[in-house]
């Protein structure tokens, strides 16, 4: 970890850079008339709602007692089309409460950053802040009896109440010494969460953070890197934490030009994947070279009997390359299986499915172990945020080498779906998949529950939400009794 003097110097420099970036961001305003992430299906919601009389088609499984939560960017006030990036918009969480076979409510609430509190005319939310921004907009999950909204690159987690209200910006009771991540992964054997965290103000190191089942940080290990890589996600196996050090890195030029998301494709950055023993040191990391690409999301990983490590990922050919600066863009996103050889320090890549896809999820009771099924959202080649056409979900049988498709039909756009196992499950796919599906024609949204073992069949239940929920980022099921 950095010394107090280094931390103070970095904070001063960060404030100075932020001031220059803010000035140039104001100069961008008015230079662009439109932004696909501020209009059409992405047009932000303008109010917080609580709806209790929800129309249900089908039957909600009575075993489901908890909240489905999903978060995403949703500006709380006017946003400049020229200066807005989807990854940095104000966070809004959407939730549906299920109990006893009923949908008790839908709610949406902004995450109270300082900017959101000002826009809503409210006092600032309590709790300390970290990094250039306190916007939190990328993931939401339950851990240690609390609900947490998460972001990467410096911001602290935000603790939410049962009705999704912001309680506090909370570095896990003061035990977290730097920023966190949007993607911690829970070890199903120990209940610990593992995370690889990076800071926008620290270009030469990332951190391995371990969170106890009680919600307190028990380990923070600094790991040297170069160029400030954007590490959105990681993965765990029985013995390792997998680090994705890939060629999207911090760009001072982009920051100083006023663009709020200062990460760009860097062809000069060495692409590599690290195997960190869970209790090891930075010197113990085994770095394996991989052909240049970018991965937002691995699905799962595990170790083989011969000492190799399997990692299944959605691999973008490039990311944040070229002229598009409003959000993610790549031409190809196949689902791949990577085999990491810690002896040869190499990665071999095999395409499981060449069709574009994202948001891969397994049955997370199998996290870090050999598994059979993976679920993902179709992402057509050349995806256009202004005219999205991703109507399908995929189910991969990795043992049989087959794929099933659930197509919601033209004008019905699913996001990430999460697998929830049946309490009495014996088979890996005995459970439900759940997520939001936007109905473009009717400016509405359905919360859909699919039977995972009847993937191509009709939904088990569909709950109508009578407004359009803008496409978001990540969601999770938070059971009332974990």
Task: Locate the predicted segments by residue.
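Beta-propeller domains
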Residues: 1-482
């Amino acid at each position: 970890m950095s010394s107090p003097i280094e931390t103070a110097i970095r904070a001063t420099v960060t404030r100075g850079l932020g001031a220059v970036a803010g000035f140039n961001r104001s100069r961008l305003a008015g230079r662009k008339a439109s932004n696909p992430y501020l209009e059409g299906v992405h047009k932000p919601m303008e109010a917080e709602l609580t709806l209790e009389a929800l129309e249900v088609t089908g039957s909600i499984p009575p075993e489901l007692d908890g909240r489905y939560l999903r978060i995403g960017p949703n500006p709380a006030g006017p946003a400049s089309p020229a200066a807005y990036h989807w990854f940095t918009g104000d966070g809004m969480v959407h939730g549906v409460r299920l109990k006893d076979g009923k949908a008790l409510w839908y709610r949406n609430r902004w995450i109270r950053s300082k900017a959101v509190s000002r826009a809503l005319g409210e006092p600032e939310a309590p709790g300390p802040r970290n990094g250039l921004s306190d916007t939190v907009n990328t993931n939401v999950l339950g851990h240690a009896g609390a609900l947490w909204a998460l972001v990467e690159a410096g911001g602290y987690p935000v603790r939410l109440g049962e009705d999704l209200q912001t309680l506090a910006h909370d570095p896990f009771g003061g035990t977290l010494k730097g920023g966190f991540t949007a993607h911690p992964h829970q070890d199903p054997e120990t209940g610990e969460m593992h995370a690889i965290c990076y800071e926008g103000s620290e270009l030469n190191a990332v951190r391995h953070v371990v969170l106890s089942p009680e919600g307190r940080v028990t380990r923070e290990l600094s790991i040297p890197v170069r160029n400030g890589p954007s590490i959105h996600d990681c993965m765990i196996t029985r013995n390792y934490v997998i680090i994705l050090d890939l060629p999207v890195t911090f760009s001072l030029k982009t920051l100083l030009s006023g663009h709020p998301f200062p990460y760009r494709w860097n062809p000069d950055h060495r692409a590599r994947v690290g195997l960190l023993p869970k209790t090891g040191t930075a010197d113990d990391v085994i770095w394996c070279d991989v052909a240049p690409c970018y991965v937002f999301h691995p699905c799962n990983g595990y170790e083989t009997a011969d000492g190799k490590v399997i990692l299944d990922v959605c691999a973008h050919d490039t990311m944040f390359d070229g002229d598009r600066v409003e959000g993610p863009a790549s031409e190809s996103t196949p689902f791949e299986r990577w085999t990491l050889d810690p002896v040869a320090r190499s990665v071999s890549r095999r395409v499981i499915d060449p069709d574009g896809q994202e948001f891969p999820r397994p049955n997370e009771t199998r996290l870090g172990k050999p598994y059979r099924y993976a679920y993902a959202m179709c992402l057509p080649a050349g995806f256009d945020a202004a005219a999205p056409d991703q109507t399908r979900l995929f189910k991969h049988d990795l043992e049989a080498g087959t794929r099933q498709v659930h197509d919601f039909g033209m004008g019905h756009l699913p996001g990430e779906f999460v697998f929830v196992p049946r309490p009495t499950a014996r088979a890996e796919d005995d459970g439900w998949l759940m997520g939001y599906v936007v109905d473009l024609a009717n400016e509405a949204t359905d919360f859909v529950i699919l039977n995972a073992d009847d993937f191509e069949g009709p939904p088990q239940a569909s709950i109508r939400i009578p407004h359009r929920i803008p496409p978001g980022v990540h969601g999770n099921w938070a059971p009332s009794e974990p």
